[in-house]
UniProtKB/Swiss-Prot annotation:
Gene: rplN
Gene3D superfamilies xref list: Ribosomal protein L14
Subunit structure: Part of the 50S ribosomal subunit. Forms a cluster with proteins L3 and L19. In the 70S ribosome, L14 and L19 interact and together make contacts with the 16S rRNA in bridges B5 and B8.
HAMAP family per the UniProt record, alphabetical: Ribosomal_uL14
GO cellular component, one term: cytosolic large ribosomal subunit
Family: Belongs to the universal ribosomal protein uL14 family.
GO MF entries: large ribosomal subunit rRNA binding; structural constituent of ribosome
Keywords attached to this entry: Ribonucleoprotein, Ribosomal protein, RNA-binding, rRNA-binding
GO BP, one annotated term: translation
Protein source organism: Symbiobacterium thermophilum (strain DSM 24528 / JCM 14929 / IAM 14863 / T)
Entries under Pfam families matching the protein: Ribosomal_L14 (PF00238)
The protein, known as: Large ribosomal subunit protein uL14
InterPro entries named in the record: Ribosomal_uL14 (IPR000218), Ribosomal_uL14_bac-type (IPR005745), Ribosomal_uL14_CS (IPR019972), Ribosomal_uL14_sf (IPR036853)
Highest classification ranks of the organism: Bacteria, Bacillati, Bacillota, Clostridia, Eubacteriales
Length: 122
């Protein structure tokens, strides 16, 4: 569960290292985001020479959460960190590589490019 002010790691090679959620998209009173949801973030930490700089406002999709999520078969999937992938305007990833595992639920939300770039889909 990601809410406003939550810090997330970046799971791609855009140059950003840490993001802070500033808005959960999908309704005026929506408070929490889960895996597969799009959020608006501010870049809090970035490496020099990257595509994005510190202070940039970007959209990102949540790919891993500590809270985890319940699947239809009753099983749960949970990760060690909160992580997101920075998106372009057409919901394609801005980077060319994805680091770490991603959840299978991204396929249902039609983030097929992220699924294909990820080294592991759980």
């Amino acid at each position: 569960m990601i809410q406003v002010q939550t810090r997330l790691q970046v799971a791609d090679n855009t140059g950003a290292k840490e993001l802070m959620c500033i808005k959960v998209l999908g309704g005026s009173w929506r408070r929490y985001a889960n895996i597969g949801d799009v959020i608006v973030c501010s870049v809090k930490e970035a490496s020099p020479g990257g595509v994005v700089k510190k202070g940039d406002v970007v959209r990102a999709v949540v790919v891993r959460t500590k809270k985890g999520l319940r699947r239809e078969d009753g099983s749960y999937i949970r990760f060690d960190e909160n992580a997101a992938v920075i998106l372009k305007d057409d919901k394609e990833p801005r980077g060319t590589r994805i680091f770490g595992p991603v959840a299978r639920e991204l396929r249902d939300k039609e983030f097929m490019k992220i699924i294909s770039l990820a080294p592991e889909v759980l």
